């Protein structure tokens, strides 16, 4: 039974039992930036189990794409070396949300395994939680499993309810006993039944886990029965496929064998048992589906996990002798195997291939040098009897050659060498500190502050009647007073000035007190809740304790908030037009424009840009209210607010709803979408592999841009004596006229070449029966020189000829020798003789050669020596 059949039979079976077939969710968990990747079937139903989400069904079944790499769920180092570890796997599952419970879950599992998949009942063992008599009795008395094949597993992990057979989502919340089903491969395979000292052997393999969410656990550890118990089951597709296909390793199933053969084809390897081929076959699945779901190779978060997996695959290809990109070529083979079950993979085939190819090309530039250094270090270490690689070297490989630490560890592990992780971490932390120090705003570097926080009023107000100066800094040092002309930083107890944060530039404006005026050039954060107003005291004097009137530059703020609000609308529009793989990778919003970096692998087409503009401007025309609300982080993400993975959020966050966009954001925004006025994208380009950048303008900036564009359009129309509406067809007419004139010019040049040929032929000098000619043609291009050369060779029949022309201070040369004379005179040598005298060089065939030069003033003398040079040859 093929993998595809096993998957479809599972889903069809549970659909026949009243379950709704739910498509696999993304590998990037929706609205849960705390979870690196989806790693089980229940992730997309987490809120249903917690009671915070309701679905229109109470029974569900799915085949969930899952990844375990990075974070606490990390199988990376074992992949390729064991029979059942993978970075990517599919989890088959059936779920009950307060519908059926243990009896039906157990009976369904047994029916599927023994009736549909036709596994021998005598080969199946089960485990139950030691105190779960209900499940035990169902297995023994209703299903009929002999008691000798039912194993009770107690608290075997050091504390109450800490057991392989007791599941809990977290320290508190839904939990309950579970029952696992094992397949017995028979006495020919070493290993003992679950719960025995030999349980880690390969004879008894767990194939299905049935979790019974029966209790709610509080902070004191008290267990309270749930009013509506739930069921969550998971069966690894690769594991059950190995059992049904009568093989002991997941890598022997049909899907993996096809990918292993494809990897062998691209790496030119005949031995299909190479562990490196297994690594490559596993990794192409994880990498491809991560890219499908919007992850792009990068240096942090999910992007760095993807980069690590890609580079591990490349290293194993390199180990097999592959020195050029190969990994991306396996995407087509993966689509052939899994594209029908997951059409999103087939749809994204081109994008996935391009992203992987770009990452391969990047790493292949450095892998050879990096591996040479690592191999030399390991050889030296072995000679000295060492067992640990220097962490500083591992860091150098990471920093200079792009070797993730686990890749270096992978290479070392193959030679039974450890890596000094502590030294690696120390080097990494040292670099981070240096980068952090170098990146500090120079005015804020070293500022020491331990006073009160700044209270921000800028959401509602642009000026305050008074605010107190609570700290002053000049040249990075705290001072009591500031004198006219001095530049420094002022901290206020209250301010309407927005401090640079979240990609939004800090406010500008003034602080006034009597005749004292402090011009604020920028506002930044000295600490998380302490705002530094940086600028110059243009008049008067200020001291700590003085009261000032803060006034934000209203025009600049208005332009900034228009750009910021438009960014939110644009982000949503980009995801709508390009796909949900689009994720924010950086932004800068100021009064002039919004700059937005996002994950996408191809340049946007003109049509896509227009669609994004249309969507945003439609939101602007609807003129809907903007709403900001403070709420707990968990509630915010559950409400659908977009959060950025890797960002650190407080317990309470600000949710900004503008139009159809909903994001976590602490920035300042318009009151209504109509306040943005107008939105226009002015720049689209690439900034890194898989990262695009869009720049856009709004409001009066957009209007002025379009007015300038209109003025240029009118100017161009006037130059062509046309109305702006007639410009395109008029340009077409002009282009047609230009083409006609160019054609006529070519005809005239050809005619000129013919007439010049007749005249030049008469200038040829006879040298021992060979006609020799060296001449400069006025106004000729290279094509004309060639045509003239051909006519002269035909006319003179036996000849050695050099023709030259000068244009834009450069010399063009062509030498031609008739076939009867090439034994003595070579065109390449002849043209070089002339070219070297005019600052150039050239070459070509014995009968025709071309050259160029940069010193036209020396051309007459160079041509005058041709006859003598040919005479010496013949």
UniProtKB/Swiss-Prot annotation:
Q: Which reaction does it catalyse?
A: tRNA(Ala) + L-alanine + ATP = L-alanyl-tRNA(Ala) + AMP + diphosphate
Q: Which residues bind Zn(2+)?
A: 564, 568, 665, 669
An example GO biological process term is:
negative regulation of DNA-templated transcription
Q: Which InterPro entries does the annotation name? A: aa-tRNA-synth_II/BPL/LPL, Ala-tRNA-lgiase_IIc, Ala-tRNA-ligase_IIc_anticod-bd, Ala-tRNA-synth_IIc_core, Ala-tRNA-synth_IIc_N, Ala-tRNA_ligase, Ala_tRNA_ligase_euk/bac, DHHA1_dom
According to its UniProt record, where is this protein mainly located?
A: cytoplasm
- Recorded GO CC terms: cytosol
Q: Which cofactor does it need?
A: Zn(2+)
> What does the cofactor section's free text say about binding?
Binds 1 zinc ion per subunit.
* Domain of life from the UniProt record: Bacteria
Q: What top-tier enzyme class does this entry carry? A: ligase
As for subcellular location, the record says: Cytoplasm
For this protein, the Enzyme Commission number is 6.1.1.7
Keywords on record: Aminoacyl-tRNA synthetase, ATP-binding, Cytoplasm, Ligase, Metal-binding, Nucleotide-binding, Protein biosynthesis, RNA-binding, tRNA-binding, Zinc
| GO molecular function annotations of the record | alanine-tRNA ligase activity; aminoacyl-tRNA deacylase activity; ATP binding; tRNA binding; zinc ion binding
Entry text on domains: Consists of three domains; the N-terminal catalytic domain, the editing domain and the C-terminal C-Ala domain. The editing domain removes incorrectly charged amino acids, while the C-Ala domain, along with tRNA(Ala), serves as a bridge to cooperatively bring together the editing and aminoacylation centers thus stimulating deacylation of misacylated tRNAs.
User: What does the similarity note say?
Assistant: Belongs to the class-II aminoacyl-tRNA synthetase family.
Q: What does this protein do?
A: Catalyzes the attachment of alanine to tRNA(Ala) in a two-step reaction: alanine is first activated by ATP to form Ala-AMP and then transferred to the acceptor end of tRNA(Ala). Also edits incorrectly charged Ser-tRNA(Ala) and Gly-tRNA(Ala) via its editing domain.
Name-wise, this protein is Alanine--tRNA ligase
Gene name in the database record: alaS
